[in-house]
Amino acid sequence: MKYDFTSIEKKWQTRWQAEATFATGTDHSKPKYYVLDMFPYPSGSGLHVGHLEGYTASDIIARYKRSSGYNVLHPMGWDAFGLPAEQFAIKTGTHPRITTEANVKNFKGTLQAMGFSYDWEREINTTDSGYFKWTQWIFLQLYDRGLAYMSEVDVNWCEELKTVLANEEVDEKLADGYTVVRRPLRQWVLKITAYAERLLADLEELDWPENVKQMQRNWIGRSEGVEIDFELRCHRTTLKAYTTRPDTLFGATYLVIAPEHPMAEKLATAPQLLVVKEYITKAKLKSDLERTGLQKEKSGVFTGSYAINPATGQPLPIWISDFVLISYGTGAIMSVPAHDSRDWAFAKQYNLPIIEVIKSPHDVQEAVFEEKNSTCVNSANDEISLNGLDFATAFERMATWLESKKVGKRKVNYKLRDWIFSRQRYWGEPIPIKHYEDGTIRPETNLPLELPAVEAYHPTSTGESPLANITEWLIGNDEHGAFRRETNTMPQWAGSCWYYLRFIDPHNHAQVVDGNNERYWMNVDLYIGGAEHAVLHLLYSRFWHKVLYDLGVVSTKEPFQKLFNQGMILGEDNEKMSKSRGNVIPADHVLQRYGADAVRLYEMFLGPLEQVKPWNTNGIEGISRFLGKVWRFVYPEHSEAATQPSNEPLPDELLRRMHKTIKKVGDDTSSLKFNTAIAEMMVFVNELTKTGCNNREAIETLLKLLAPYAPHMTEELWEALGHTNSISHEPFPTFNPALVEENMAIIAVQVNGKLRGTFTVPAKSPKEMLLEEARKVESVAKFLEGKTIVKEIVVPDKLVNFAVK
């Protein structure tokens, strides 16, 4: 009988659903394992083969852990609010909910066709009112704790999309060709900076890829420095500037402030006022990325004012430049051009002094010297000398001196900025806030606050969302008086900040999550998804989780204990899959042609899970042939009936081979080395085929090992062998350590440390036998002839070394 994957896969998917095979266990006395995918945004284009990689990996682990005795939580849902659905609604007039429901149905169909063992009873959708009720509730907890506030801020405004972009979203939109400018707008902002230190410190407790942790460290951007008060000439005040290099203060030759600095226009002298105003106006139209790009030519304007360097007493010209951001430090910096590349380029461009204060191997007039591993020079006055000191010592001495003079203080700063949370669009969670005529603000008490129906989805010309046009929803009265509802909506990130918690208790109408269930399941043991979410989603989720921890809602400090980033699967042209390149391989196409088990195995066999690798259709043919070999153990060629294997004992060599396979597949599966686990199973299949083995123990063991990878075929063959239970409920095979040990050892023989030959002996042979056999090796004997052996070194099962003279 030929393997008909179409009917067999449908049969088992239907049965799994009917029998709730993958329902989450409720026995809290068992060990638990929570394996989670980064849930998808259900786009109209559907899933391609690259999307399936991470889902397949998580499913293999979920199945493996179930068979290893764990209660497994393996859920799926939909991050369904977002801009693409709204843009489609603007274009077609179709309500976003309609397109979202169609897209979800398409996505779910593909995931079910892959045989993923999700507990679909726990399915969630961020656009369901029963879900976003709790998203709104969490927002109000942030508001009550002073972590959500309104502010008139300069935002990243995308003219084409008519909405605000978070700082973290700007790069992507610019790369896509959108225009991003800065403009002031009333915004809701979340005070993520209040958690900066904890977000940074707790990274050390996480089993995450080091590059992802480093990206978060860089984004948080903690630095230790000194805030220095520079006395202004002709002004009865000071200008504060933050620096991480107080050791270079003697080399500061000018100051630079951000165009948005509150003193920018005040510092402009009469002759400079016009050019200063023009420069400030132009700077405000640029995004932060445009302003701070390392390759851009530095621009600036002199204010006409000066400050005094407290170490030298020399006047420092004060400039305005857009490479300084008001959001970092004080919005003012001291510039030491000899030892900072940006300052050096600016000084050269505007002919400003360059003074060496760190001993440099070259002329700092010709090139900057930025290394810290040198000593201070030209750094002394009547009260303090840094000359000859290293960085750390000079830092401390200067910081102490500045504090003693009351012109500076030590300070920790962060690059992290508060999260601009509101969006000027329709398809997002309404922010549950009422604005009253007397100026007070009160939260909505009756959650969820749902979106009203609208006829047009375009943002208003003033930048408000379409909700501003729905008067019957917008305006109301209650016991506190007349009010106007908040028209901004939440960003797409809101729903994904806490979804992992809702999966634990998705049908709870009384609270976000039941405490007992949360304490059992949290935190997530394995979180699989793309590295592109390193800063955005992961940082935001960690922030919300820490707030919920402080509220007593959750019991863990962090949501995701282990993070794994799968590598991208490229198109067959070795390029990233995209519609514009025409190299997208739709998942449904390969499923129809090869079946789910072949696709699952092939994606995992392509290479290490974390590596980028190209799709190759020829490769999946080889996987299909491998599955055919497995099929023929039970359904030989030209046979319509299943053959029942023999119960005769396995030959010793095959028995050892089987136990080694069990160990290797188990070890590699648990460490996500799926490609080598599959390779080991292929070797075992070839051994069984070559020897004509028809042993029940060997074949059933193979099926149990293969079941997490190819669940449909293994279920079918398991049933054909006479079993009535699902193979998904079978324990994963265990190996006998005595049968796994190597019974032969290859011994390397060295003479004076150089390899001269090898020989093979039974493992654990005594030292005397190893020395005797080593001397007999022909290629070794000639190097011993006529020599005196002064020392013999033996490493059991590995090495013999003769020291001769």
UniProtKB/Swiss-Prot annotation:
It is found in: Cytoplasm. This is Leucine--tRNA ligase. SUPFAM superfamilies: Anticodon-binding domain of a subclass of class I aminoacyl-tRNA synthetases, Nucleotidylyl transferase, ValRS/IleRS/LeuRS editing domain. It catalyses: tRNA(Leu) + L-leucine + ATP = L-leucyl-tRNA(Leu) + AMP + diphosphate. Signal peptide: none annotated. The keyword Ligase applies. Keywords: Aminoacyl-tRNA synthetase, ATP-binding, Cytoplasm, Ligase, Nucleotide-binding, Protein biosynthesis. Gene3D superfamilies: 3.10.20.590, HUPs (3.40.50.620), Isoleucyl-tRNA Synthetase, Domain 1 (1.10.730.10). A motif ('KMSKS' region) lies at residues 576-580. GO terms for biological process: leucyl-tRNA aminoacylation. Its EC number is 6.1.1.4. InterPro entries: aa-tRNA-synth_Ia (IPR002300), Leu-tRNA-ligase (IPR002302), Leu_tRNA-synth_edit (IPR025709), M/V/L/I-tRNA-synth_anticd-bd (IPR013155), Methionyl/Leucyl_tRNA_Synth (IPR015413), Rossmann-like_a/b/a_fold (IPR014729), tRNAsynth_Ia_anticodon-bd (IPR009080), Val/Leu/Ile-tRNA-synth_edit (IPR009008). Belongs to the class-I aminoacyl-tRNA synthetase family. It comes from the Bacteria. ATP binds at K579. One of its GO terms (molecular function) is ATP binding. It holds the Pfam family Anticodon_1. Its main location: cytoplasm. A motif ('HIGH' region) lies at residues 40-51. One of its GO terms (cellular component) is cytosol.
